[in-house]
Swiss-Prot record:
Catalytic activity: N-terminal glycyl-[protein] + tetradecanoyl-CoA = N-tetradecanoylglycyl-[protein] + CoA + H(+)
Enzyme Commission designation: 2.3.1.97
Protein name, per record: Putative glycylpeptide N-tetradecanoyltransferase
UniProt-recorded Gene Ontology molecular function terms: glycylpeptide N-tetradecanoyltransferase activity
Purpose of the protein: Adds a myristoyl group to the N-terminal glycine residue of certain proteins.
Top enzyme category: transferase
Length: 358
């Protein structure tokens, strides 16, 4: 890890990045809880991770749905997490807690930095009251400090009682695709007009490997007006954007010479309805750029394509340029706060930032 030259910053007056953690690491907490231990995990443990997350991962504030992921999605995600940064909390050889750190290239107010994005933080429901989450947090902090990293990015559902200072927050919106199914589970009113997203001669097609160079360059240009944004490489585009069945779907439009002029990408995850046990398929809007049409036109073409891949609704957050999407949508219960640990930075408007929505 230390040989990868991960952490180059060029600090300016807008933000301050701490290179040393000012808090004292707690004593090994597992010693205080009999039977618990820490275990380093990897993709070989995907079945255990899948079971834990699908039963105990985050729910919306009203406890209506739980976000769940397919086994294939988790395997794909974990492959990009560096060794030693998929950390499990075990109780008598059973996985009861998880935390991961995915290192992402970000530009934050003109500072280019590779930063750990903390994700899939999960503790089994029945043991949350014992404060076991601190075990995972302290273990991750310790491993990061060993490679000289005292900062991180993370998110959490909006909590009215939280005293933590976030630098921005976003709200999720949904555009119905499979209206009959969404009506049957109560996600949209019975009297809501059915939407027909079918478009004849849709110019979008799935992205292919030969598009990676062009897409990488154009996305970085399209994102450059944002103060907080990813910096994409051909490697990260290959992993996070190139289509992979049941994980990521990316569509492009080409001109008469075959050059990509427009692109749009979504991730696939699911909403598990706690009361009924029914499952809704979500397309989570991610990266895009548009040169030959406005954003609403691009999303309309996307909705037509998503019908053929079994998606029930398109979900998007009100960051990036997403406020320009002029299509009937429904506000969800998904409100997310964004934090920069050990980074002092300005409050940031959602339309001035973008993070990979995974």
């Amino acid at each position: 890890m230390s040989n990868l030259n991960l952490f180059e910053t060029n600090q300016n007056k807008s933000i301050s990045i701490m290179t040393q953690d000012i808090t004292k690491l707690l004593d090994p907490l597992t010693e205080k809880f009999d039977g618990f231990s820490i275990k380093t995990l990897n993709v070989k443990h995907v079945d255990e991770i899948h079971e834990l997350l699908n039963k105990h991962y985050i729910e919306d504030n009203d406890h209506i749905i739980r976000i769940i992921y397919s086994r294939d999605f988790l395997y794909w995600y974990l492959k990009y997490v560096p060794n030693n940064f998929t950390i499990g909390l075990m109780y008598k050889n059973k996985l009861v807690g998880l935390i991961t750190a995915l290192f992402v290239d970000m530009i934050m107010y003109d500072n280019k930095i590779k930063i750990p994005y903390i994700n899939f933080f999960c503790i089994q429901n029945k043991i949350r009251k014992f404060g076991l989450s601190n075990i995972l947090i302290e273990e991750l902090k310790s491993r990061l400090l060993k490679i000289g990293v005292a900062y991180s990015l993370f998110t959490r559902m909006n909590c009215q009682n939280s005293l933590d200072k976030h630098f921005t927050s976003t709200i999720d919106f949904a555009i119905p695709i499979n209206c009959p199914k969404l009506k049957s589970v109560g996600f949209i009113p019975d009297d809501e007009k059915l939407m027909n997203w079918k478009i004849e001669n849709n110019p979008l097609s799935l992205m292919v490997k030969t598009d990676i160079l062009s897409v990488t360059s154009k996305l970085n240009v399209h994102l450059q007006h944002l103060s907080v944004r990813p910096y994409l490489t051909e490697d990260s585009v290959h992993h996070f954007i190139l289509p992979k069945k049941n994980i990521v779907y990316t569509f492009v439009k080409r001109d008469s010479r075959g050059y990509v002029t427009d692109m749009v990408s979504v991730y696939k995850h699911y909403a598990y309805i706690l009361e009924t046990g029914k499952i809704i398929s979500n397309a989570q809007l991610s990266f895009y750029y548009n040169e030959t049409m406005d954003l609403t036109q691009l999303i309309l073409l996307l909705l037509d394509k998503l019908i053929n891949y079994g998606f029930d609704q398109l979900i998007f957050r009100n960051f990036y340029d997403n406020g320009k999407i002029n299509i009937t949508r429904f506000e969800t219960n998904g409100e997310l706060n964004y934090y920069a640990g050990n980074i002092s930075m300005p409050i940031t408007c959602p339309n001035n930032m973008f993070m990979i929505p995974i």
